[in-house]
């Protein structure tokens, strides 16, 4: 566990999500963690996708009043940034060793130890979802549950590996050029919000494009290399004992990956919710679709909206996933029943 001399605290009150950022020294290098909420509450850690940070991956979700009240009432949120993905991050030295996905998962343990956290709830998007799933498999006693958005769980297909290699080379030699931005935007969003010659880009895509322009391309390249070298987690998924709620956009490039992951999880613990008309970044594109499934999911841990009289400081004792997830109507979502999957 790091001592106080290993952390630099930065006042982030000006940021839209509030909280305070800590630069925590780990065996694998410094990692930026933004802490939002009451540290006496149970911990929720988040991990973003490639080239993004917590503000872009989870801002849309936390700006929904219902989601904000549900999560911030029950949790203290620890937003973990991959190396060099925080705002204003310097370029990582070219002499620094490349980290693997395993290294990034191990780094999370050091972060938890630094803050004195035990078992935590986890929320991740795509590459971040893979890192958190790997973390849950390696350190089962440190994970209460997983909320995954468009997760990866298999090794890259040849087409994905090649696409990532092209993007990796472009990042390394040309920086975050226009082609790289388009590849990443296609990764995150559906065609509807990306726009075309007749329909302008949505505000969230324009904001994301601006964010990508500010990224340190070498830092993004490092995270991409780690994810492109990932291994298949399929065989170990059934041994996961934590509850897992998976969201997948109907138009996500990783739709089949999420379905595959659900089939590999223990049927008692996993649920898949498909959100129609969304790309991979459901938490930004259609965050309101996540609220009711998350609410029922957290009920299994005795966690409720603020109107309930249950203390969020009480120990979490997970039960099975609520049966209400079986019914799209009860979730308030217009989902295709065959694509709304729950295993009890």
From Swiss-Prot:
Involved in a signaling pathway that modulates root auxin transport and auxin gradients. Acts partially by positively regulating the auxin carrier PIN2 and AUX1. Acts, together with GB1 as positive regulator of meristem initiation and branching. GB1 and NDL2 positively regulate basipetal inflorescence auxin transport and modulate MAX2 expression in shoots, which regulates organ and lateral meristem formation by the establishment and maintenance of auxin gradients. It comes from Arabidopsis thaliana (Mouse-ear cress). It comes from the Eukaryota. Belongs to the NDRG family. It holds the Pfam family Ndr. Signal peptide: none annotated. GO terms for biological process: regulation of auxin polar transport; response to abscisic acid; response to cold; response to jasmonic acid. The keyword Cytoplasm applies. One of its GO terms (cellular component) is cytoplasm. Interacts with the heterodimers formed by GB1 and GG1, or GB1 and GG2. Interacts with RGS1. InterPro entries: AB_hydrolase_fold (IPR029058), NDRG (IPR004142). Keywords: Cytoplasm, Growth regulation. It is found in: Cytoplasm. This is Protein NDL2. The gene is NDL2.
């Amino acid at each position: 566990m790091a001592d106080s001399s290993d952390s630099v605290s930065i006042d982030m009150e000006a940021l839209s999500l509030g909280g305070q950022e800590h630069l925590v020294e780990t065996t694998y290098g410094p990692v930026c963690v933004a802490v939002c909420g009451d540290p006496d509450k149970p911990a929720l850690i988040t991990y973003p996708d490639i080239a993004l940070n917590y503000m872009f991956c989870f801002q849309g979700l936390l700006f929904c009043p219902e989601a904000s009240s549900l999560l911030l009432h029950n949790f203290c949120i620890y937003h973990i940034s991959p190396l060099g993905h925080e705002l204003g991050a310097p370029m990582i030295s070219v002499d620094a060793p490349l980290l693997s996905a395993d290294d990034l998962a191990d780094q999370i343990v050091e972060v938890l130890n630094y803050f004195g956290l035990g078992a935590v709830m986890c929320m991740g998007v795509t590459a971040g979802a893979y890192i958190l799933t790997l973390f849950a498999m390696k350190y089962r006693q440190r994970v209460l549950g997983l909320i995954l958005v468009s997760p990866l769980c298999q090794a890259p297909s040849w087409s994905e590996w090649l696409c990532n290699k092209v993007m990796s080379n472009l990042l390394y030699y040309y920086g975050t050029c226009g082609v790289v931005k388009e590849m990443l935007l296609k990764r995150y969003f559906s065609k509807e919000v990306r726009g075309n010659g007749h329909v302008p880009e949505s505000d969230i895509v324009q904001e994301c494009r601006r964010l990508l322009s500010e990224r340190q391309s070498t830092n993004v390249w490092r995270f991409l290399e780690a994810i492109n070298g990932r291994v298949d987690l399929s065989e170990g998924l059934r041994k996961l004992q934590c509850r897992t709620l998976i969201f997948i956009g109907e138009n996500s490039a990783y739709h089949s990956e999420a379905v595959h992951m659900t089939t590999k999880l223990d049927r008692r613990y996993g649920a898949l919710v498909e959100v129609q008309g969304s790309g991979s970044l459901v938490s930004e594109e259609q965050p309101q679709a996540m609220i009711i499934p998350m609410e029922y999911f957290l009920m299994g841990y005795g966690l409720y909206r603020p109107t309930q009289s249950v203390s969020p400081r009480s120990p979490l004792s997970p039960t099975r996933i609520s049966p209400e997830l079986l019914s799209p109507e009860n979730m308030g979502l217009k989902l295709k029943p065959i694509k709304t999957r729950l295993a009890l």
